[in-house]
Amino acid sequence: MGRPLVGILLLLAMPVRSETLVEHGRYLAETIAVCTNCHTPRGPNGPLLDKKLGGGEVIKHQDFTAVVPNITPDRETGIGAWTDNEIMSAIREGRRPDGSLIGPAMPSRFYRGLSDEDVRAIVAYLRAVPAVHNPITAKSHYDRPLPASWGPPVGQVAEPPKDDKIAYGAYLAGPVARCMDCHTEQHNGLEAALGAGGKAFYGPWGVSVSANVTSDESDGIGDWSDAEIERAIRTGVARDGHKLFPPMPFTAYTGITADDMTALIAYLRSLPPRVEPAPLSGSGQAPGAAGSRH
């Protein structure tokens, strides 16, 4: 009787997730990590939900033109023929099954930090979505050669404890939601000031410039209340009531759980105050563009 009892006690001691792996993957891919934001084609009235994750969107940047791939289970035009490990390698290491490197705008340098549990959940979700047959003939183009890799092979990655709000918030703002990717300007690949904003984005809406999300009280969000920060993230409405601009995916962020939002805000509160960096001469960026913050 001793062994079965020990086994039962061990099972009871294990953390239990209230949602299934696929449900957790759906939350990540559709809400906080917003894979759907890039990988779902758009029409004049918004995302084409019958082609969710079917790819084909073109992302234009001053250094590249990226054609977004189909990541549905379609075996011919998607990733249906890939193994789970191959999909995980594509997400965390930016490496396709044929060995070629996935370039920007895929944020592989952030996804390297995704926990084993979270990346498995995303794979389970991608296996479960309807297959979309969407042949994509256009190719991505990069003005600069891609590196040989985005880093060494990723080993085991543990998730930070959820009861450490700042550490877990840093995980959400980094590898999961990639807040710091947009809200940190980089010059020659170096992060000038984490969270200080100033990065320009060009789209159908015009030009938007990422906001300073550090604890600086004049240039950042240091004097905002938690409710004001949450409203900005969930609804795209700034403290003064003006509407924020894309590419921040406010519609998806409405579904962020209360616990995750608390952790995100705790992390943002912990960022040292920084002033938004000035653009490089000739960069063409417009950090001071009125009404174009996000």
Language-model segments: which ranges?
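Soluble non-cytosolic domains of exported or imported proteins
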Residues: 19, 29, 81-82, 113-117, ...
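Bacterial N-terminal signal peptides
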Residues: 2-13
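The canonical Cys-X-X-Cys-His
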Residues: 25, 32-42, 87, 122, ...
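Extended amphipathic alpha-helical interaction segments
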Residues: 156-157, 181, 188-191
